[in-house]
Amino acid sequence: MDDISATTIQTNHQDLVNDVTYDFYGRRMVSCSADQRVKVYDFNDDTETWAITSEWRAGDASLMRVAWAHPSFGQVLAVCSLDRGVRIYEEQKKNFESKTWVEVAKLMDARSAVLDISFCPFQHGCKLAAVSADATLRIYEAMEPGNLTYWTLMNEIALMPSPPSRNEQPAFCVNWCPSRWREQYIAVGCMNDAYIYKQNSHGKWKKVAELPGHTDLIRDICWAPSMGSSYYLIATACKDGNVRIFKVETLCEEVFQEEEDAGNSMTEDSNFNLNSLKVELIGEYDNHKCQVWRCRFNVTGTILSSSGDDGCVRLWKASYANLFKCISVVSLEKKPEKL
């Protein structure tokens, strides 16, 4: 693998940066912080640097996550906050020479802090999943993608019998399966547990699998792009210091079809049970030796990045039989290590 170079970007945030993410093309970047501000950066080809082009206050409390919508819907951002809100921003023309970000919608259905958000693949419409500390997953949809002012709350899913107590630290995360052509799946981290939900033909979401083995709070969860493979990969970042990678395979489609055809004579939950998917833990790595906070796959699903309290970003590459190996460690304190 080629040597990895690290560049420091001066965000000028006044508090912890809770999230950073690229847009679809990797030419723009956005950060959100506990200082309640969102900052958008554009890449300059001439200087090969990132420059802040827009910034604004996006809530009344710490901002937890920010997400780009697919560019087919325009330049659109969603931001979630500890103030229980999810805000939608759209970049609009201010005049002939400049643009500005405008808040076009505010979703305030949560009864507690919203901790994570995820847009679905654009082929399934303009949908947004939001999970909050009240142990509830909410699915929103902009029925008219050309008008992002109006969002409909399509589903409200209780992840636990009751929310965590005030003495417990809440930990919830969500990630939409990036597959464009298959069924719609959502992976959810719920305290020490992780689940996969599937949408049926009636638009209802049901739990179809569990990702086992976690012994502490799950901080992040993500799907790998399938790239035409017959299975999925899901990674989790956990407070117990482990990065875990799961292989998920669907059962025979004919069985699902038979169950769907017989749906009128079956109960609502009968098509969806914890045997609908085959889940296998194929990797468990404790290289961080401390709490792991984030994990993400690259666009081909062959390299996984993880970051933890050790101040390092570790890159994991898939080898034969989906065995992942740490190939590089990136740290701001020293030159990136090639392993």
UniProtKB/Swiss-Prot annotation:
Protein's UniProt keywords contain Protease: no
WD repeats: 12-51, 58-99, 109-150, 166-209, 213-256, 287-326
Localization: Cytoplasm; Nucleus, Nuclear pore complex
GO cellular component, one term: nucleus
SMART domains from the UniProt entry: WD40
Broad class of where this protein is predominantly found: cytoplasm
GO biological process, one term: protein transport
InterPro entries: Sec13/Seh1_fam, WD40/YVTN_repeat-like_dom_sf, WD40_repeat_dom_sf, WD40_rpt
Keywords tagged on the record: Cytoplasm, mRNA transport, Nuclear pore complex, Nucleus, Protein transport, Repeat, Translocation, Transport, WD repeat
A GO MF label: structural molecule activity
Isomerase is among the record's keywords: no
Annotated Pfam families: WD40 (PF00400)
Family in the record: Belongs to the WD repeat SEC13 family.
PANTHER family, per database record: NUCLEAR PORE COMPLEX PROTEIN SEC13 / SEH1 FAMILY MEMBER, NUCLEOPORIN SEH1
Its biological purpose: Functions as a component of the nuclear pore complex (NPC). NPC components, collectively referred to as nucleoporins (NUPs), can play the role of both NPC structural components and of docking or interaction partners for transiently associated nuclear transport factors. Active directional transport is assured by both, a Phe-Gly (FG) repeat affinity gradient for these transport factors across the NPC and a transport cofactor concentration gradient across the nuclear envelope.
Known partners and oligomeric status: Component of the nuclear pore complex (NPC). NPC constitutes the exclusive means of nucleocytoplasmic transport. NPCs allow the passive diffusion of ions and small molecules and the active, nuclear transport receptor-mediated bidirectional transport of macromolecules such as proteins, RNAs, ribonucleoparticles (RNPs), and ribosomal subunits across the nuclear envelope. Due to its 8-fold rotational symmetry, all subunits are present with 8 copies or multiples thereof. Component of the npc107-120 complex which consists of nup85, nup107, nup120, nup131, nup132 and seh1.
Protein name: Nucleoporin seh1
Organism per entry: Schizosaccharomyces pombe (strain 972 / ATCC 24843)
